[in-house]
């Protein structure tokens, strides 16, 4: 009887170990983050590109249009335009580095506008971008311009609630509020499968090693 109990306990422990190992492997796979680099120059020019081409230039609309453009460019070309870190806020994804840039110019950032961003745009009524220059198109590839133009065409005319709902995609819903959305999840939302995602990660690692 005791031998039988010991045997069963051993089997249970073995099965639990297998489950824990499987969960650990799955967690490792799920937490594999795409190695995306933030590009401040492209982000600034994406902002100017959008702000000069939409009628309503509020933060919310601009943030969402750039998010959709980043997502589409990732699907089409294997990398986003800006490489920003999107935070899953209640109203949808917010590009945190771009938001910091806007706050520098607005004057409520803990960082001063030491790089002279105010020569490119101003902030009016706390939440509207007034572009002072157009985008430097030499800083945005034709494919990046196309992704931004497509996002403007699809989403610029939507209301606040409509574009908010569109931005509440699977990548946003799978992330806790006020946490960063992983680029892996954005890639899956863009339609990339696991094999394509692994290829992108491998390419990013090789590119980083050669840079």
Regions found by a protein language model. Give the residues of each.
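Domain-edge interaction signal
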Residues: 5-7, 14, 18-211
């Amino acid at each position: 009887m005791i031998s039988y109990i010991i045997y069963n306990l051993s089997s249970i422990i073995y099965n639990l170990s297998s489950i824990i190992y499987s969960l650990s492997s799955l967690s490792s796979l799920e937490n594999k983050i795409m190695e995306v680099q933030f590009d401040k120059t492209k982000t600034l020019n994406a902002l100017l590109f959008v702000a000069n081409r939409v009628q309503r230039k509020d933060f919310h609309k601009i943030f969402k249009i750039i998010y959709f453009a980043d997502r589409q460019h990732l699907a089409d070309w294997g990398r986003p335009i800006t490489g920003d870190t999107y935070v899953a806020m209640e109203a949808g994804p917010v590009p945190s580095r771009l938001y910091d840039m806007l706050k520098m110019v607005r004057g409520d950032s803990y960082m001063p506008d030491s790089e002279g961003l105010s020569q490119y745009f101003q902030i009016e009524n706390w939440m509207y971008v007034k572009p002072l220059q157009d985008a430097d198109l030499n800083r945005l590839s034709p494919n990046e311009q196309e992704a931004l133009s497509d996002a403007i065409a699809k989403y610029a005319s939507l209301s606040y609630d409509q574009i908010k709902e569109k931005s509440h995609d699977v990548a946003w819903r799978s992330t806790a509020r006020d946490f960063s959305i992983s680029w892996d999840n954005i890639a899956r939302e863009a339609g990339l499968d696991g094999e394509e995602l692994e290829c992108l990660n491998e390419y990013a690692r090789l590119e980083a090693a050669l840079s």
